[in-house]
Amino acid sequence: MANVQVIFVAYIAVIAFSMVYGDDYKPFGEHNSYYGCKKQTDEFCNKICKLHLAKKGGFCHQPAPFVELCKCLDIDYDNTYFLKAMEKQCPKLKGNVN
C-alpha cells in the first residue's frame, strides 16, 4: 500500500511541475497549422514562440526528414494556439470586456 501512495504522490508532483513550468510544444498558427521554418532561422522561431508566451523562446526543430517546425520551450499547452495566446495578451479580443 505504501508503494501505491509513493507512486501516486510522484505522479501528482509531475503533473503539478509541468503545469507550473510549462512544457515544450510546437505552436499552432492562426489557421491551426504548425509554423514551418524550412527557409527561416532560429530567430524566426524564437519570435514566434515569444508571441505565444513561451518563457524560454524557441528554435527550428526537425522532427522528421524533410519537416522543419518551430518548437517552443517552456510554454503552456493553451498558449500553443494562436488565438488563446492573443486573448491572454489582449483581453478585449474575448469580447466580454466593457
UniProtKB/Swiss-Prot annotation:
Keywords: Disulfide bond, G-protein coupled receptor impairing toxin, Ion channel impairing toxin, Neurotoxin, Potassium channel impairing toxin, Secreted, Signal, Toxin, Voltage-gated potassium channel impairing toxin, Voltage-gated sodium channel impairing toxin. One of its GO terms (cellular component) is extracellular region. The keyword Secreted applies. Residues 1-22 form the signal peptide. It is found in: Secreted. It comes from the Eukaryota. InterPro entries: LCN-type_CS_alpha_beta_dom (IPR044062), Scorpion_toxin-like_sf (IPR036574). The record marks F44, K47 as: Important for blocking potassium channels. One of its GO terms (molecular function) is ion channel inhibitor activity. Disulfide bonds join C37-C60, C45-C70, C49-C72. Residues 23-91 form the LCN-type CS-alpha/beta domain. Expressed by the venom gland. Homodimer; disulfide-linked or monomer (edited version) or heterodimer of an alpha chain (AC B8XH01) and this beta chain (non-edited version). Belongs to the long (3 C-C) scorpion toxin superfamily. Has the structural arrangement of an alpha-helix connected to antiparallel beta-sheets by disulfide bonds (CS-alpha/beta). The homodimer inhibits HMG-CoA reductase (HMGCR) (32% of inhibition produced by 0.6 uM), a glycoprotein involved in the control of cholesterol biosynthesis. The inhibitory effects of bumarsin are seen at much lower concentrations (0.6 uM) than that for statins such as atorvastatin (5 mM) and simvastatin (10 uM). In addition to inhibition of HMG-CoA reductase, this protein lowers cholesterol levels by inducing steroid hormone synthesis via StAR, and by increasing reverse cholesterol transport mediated by the induction of ABCA1 and APOA1. This is Lipolysis-activating peptide 1-beta chain. It comes from Buthus israelis (Israeli scorpion).
